[in-house]
A protein has these predicted regions:
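A general structural signal for stabilizing positions within well-ordered secondary structure
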Residues: 147, 165-166
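Conserved C-terminal RecA-like helicase domain
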Residues: 1-155
Length: 166
C-alpha cells in the first residue's frame, strides 16, 4: 500500500499527505456543481427560516462580464458572484443582493428606499438592477449591510476581499 501511496504522491516523510496540486485545486474551486449545492442549501434554509433568512455567501471571483447571463436561460459554466446570484434567482424566491468593489445588484423595489445618491440600470427580464453609488466602498458596504440586517435582502453574495474582513 505504501508503494501505491508514494507513487501517487500521497505519502511523504512517513505520513499520508493529501495536498492538492494547483490545477486540481483550481478545478475544485471553480466546480460548476457547487452552484447546485448552493441553490439546495439556500432552498433548504429558506424553507426553514422564510423571511428570517440571512445567508451570506463569500467568493473570490466577480466576473462582471457574466452580467449578461442574468435574466436568460443560458447555462452557467463557471462559479463567481454573478453565476451564484443567477443560480439562486432562477430557482429560489428570495431577495438577493450582490456586492463587490465594482458591482452592486439589488432588488428594484429597494431603489425608492435608498436615500444615498445612486443611479441604476435595470436588468432585463428580472426585478433587479445594477446600482451605482458615488463614494467609496465603505459607504456601499454600510448601506447593503443595513439592508441585509433589516431583512430587505435575504441572501447577500459578496467578495471575500470586500466583506470577508468586516
Amino acid at each position: 500500500i505504501i508503494k501505491i501511496l508514494i507513487k501517487n504522491n500521497i505519502y511523504e516523510n512517513k505520513k499520508v499527505c493529501f495536498s492538492l496540486k494547483d490545477n486540481l485545486k483550481r478545478k475544485l474551486i471553480s466546480s460548476v456543481g457547487k452552484l447546485d449545492s448552493i441553490v439546495k442549501i439556500t432552498t433548504c434554509e429558506y424553507d426553514s427560516l422564510k423571511s428570517n433568512l440571512r445567508e451570506l455567501i463569500l467568493t473570490d471571483y466577480i466576473r462582471k462580464e457574466n452580467v449578461n447571463l442574468i435574466g436568460t436561460n443560458e447555462s452557467l459554466t463557471s462559479i463567481n458572484i454573478v453565476t451564484i446570484f443567477e443560480s439562486i434567482r432562477r430557482k429560489v424566491n428570495v431577495n438577493i443582493g450582490v456586492i463587490s468593489g465594482s458591482l452592486v445588484i439589488l432588488p428594484l423595489f429597494l431603489s425608492s428606499t435608498i436615500t444615498l445618491k445612486h443611479s441604476l440600470k435595470k436588468i432585463e427580464n428580472t426585478d433587479y438592477a445594477i446600482f451605482s453609488f458615488s463614494g467609496d466602498n465603505k459607504i456601499k458596504v454600510e448601506l447593503v449591510s443595513k439592508l441585509f440586517s433589516e431583512g430587505r435582502i435575504n441572501v447577500l453574495i459578496g467578495t471575500k476581499s470586500l466583506l470577508g474582513e468586516g
